[in-house]
């Protein structure tokens, strides 16, 4: 049934999402625990960036080349349906979905994930934070509290993502809107658990509660950006319907309308990022900006699962 198919596909995506964040956080923590040197873990970030460049860019180009090539040969030249087994390029198209949307996406977000925690640790290690008697910072297990806080936020995000996957369920005969909301429930549930864990960590460490607010701002900003992207790309909403309507007058107007829509869709994410940076800097300085990025990426495990589940379900439908 539909619920069973959703569970299988999403569970497969969750394996990839949790693996990416788990390996990333574990690598940074082990390296910093062994060497106690921010420069060493910076090298870990450089390695992740180099792999992400090739996997994301190279994989993305291959994905689109295979997709367009398969459509040109099949639908345009031969007049056969998409994903038809008579078209050999269908295999390249299915493989391309995995290369670009799973492997490439995973490498890209792996780099962003480890880069955010490395930057936060480097800020503390470089001593750019002004600490006085009213803001004492002690060590726990050999880690500075301000270094341990982002690690705990991300660790709680991994567990929250695992628990959030159990919230993703639907009923038979569900509409596309129902399926999208089932995914949102998992993401929102994971975000709520991260906030609870962050509040407990800040309270336990006896730190300023402003650190909790910057994590909250990061989470909210991430959700707004994701919702904005969905609004401009989902066929349920007006923007894509307007682009489709332009097809009545020919392909040229579709290209123009689509390009214009893509440009205007960047406005909300840009404004949200600027506002979030201003608020977090006002609350906790440079460290607050870095910690808000940690909050934004804390639920990456389940967010990445929703990205990876798409190609899995798509290829299953093609088979």
Go through each PLM region and give its residues.
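Hydrophobic packing and interface segments
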Residues: 1-319
């Amino acid at each position: 049934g539909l619920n069973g198919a959703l569970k299988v596909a999403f569970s497969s995506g969750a394996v990839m999402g949790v693996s990416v964040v788990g390996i990333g956080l574990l690598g940074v923590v082990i390296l910093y625990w062994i060497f106690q040197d921010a420069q060493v873990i910076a090298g870990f970030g450089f390695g992740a960036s180099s792999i992400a460049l090739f996997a994301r860019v190279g994989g993305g180009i291959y994905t689109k080349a295979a997709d367009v090539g398969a459509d040109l040969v099949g639908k345009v030249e031969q007049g056969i349906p998409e994903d038809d087994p008579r078209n050999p390029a269908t295999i390249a198209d299915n493989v391309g979905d995995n290369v670009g949307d799973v492997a490439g996406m995973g490498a890209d977000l792996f780099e962003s994930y480890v880069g955010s925690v490395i930057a936060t640790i480097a800020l503390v290690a470089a001593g750019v934070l002004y600490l006085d008697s009213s803001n004492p910072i002690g060590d726990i297990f050999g880690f500075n509290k301000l270094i341990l806080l982002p690690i705990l936020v991300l660790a709680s995000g991994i567990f929250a993502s695992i628990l959030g996957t159990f919230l993703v369920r639907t009923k038979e005969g569900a509409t596309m809107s129902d399926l999208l909301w089932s995914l949102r429930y998992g993401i929102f549930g994971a975000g709520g658990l991260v906030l609870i864990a962050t509040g407990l960590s800040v309270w336990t460490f006896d730190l300023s509660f402003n650190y909790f607010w910057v994590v909250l701002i990061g989470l909210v900003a991430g959700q707004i950006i994701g919702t904005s992207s969905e609004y401009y790309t989902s066929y349920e909403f007006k923007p894509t319907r307007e682009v489709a309507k332009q097809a009545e007058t020919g392909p040229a107007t579709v290209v123009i309308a689509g390009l214009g829509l893509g440009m205007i869709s960047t406005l909300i994410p840009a404004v949200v990022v600027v506002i979030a940076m201003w608020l977090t800097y006002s609350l906790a300085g440079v460290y607050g900006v870095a910690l808000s990025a940690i909050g934004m990426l804390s639920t990456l495990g389940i967010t990445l699962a929703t990205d990876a589940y798409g190609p899995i379900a798509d290829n299953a439908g093609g088979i």
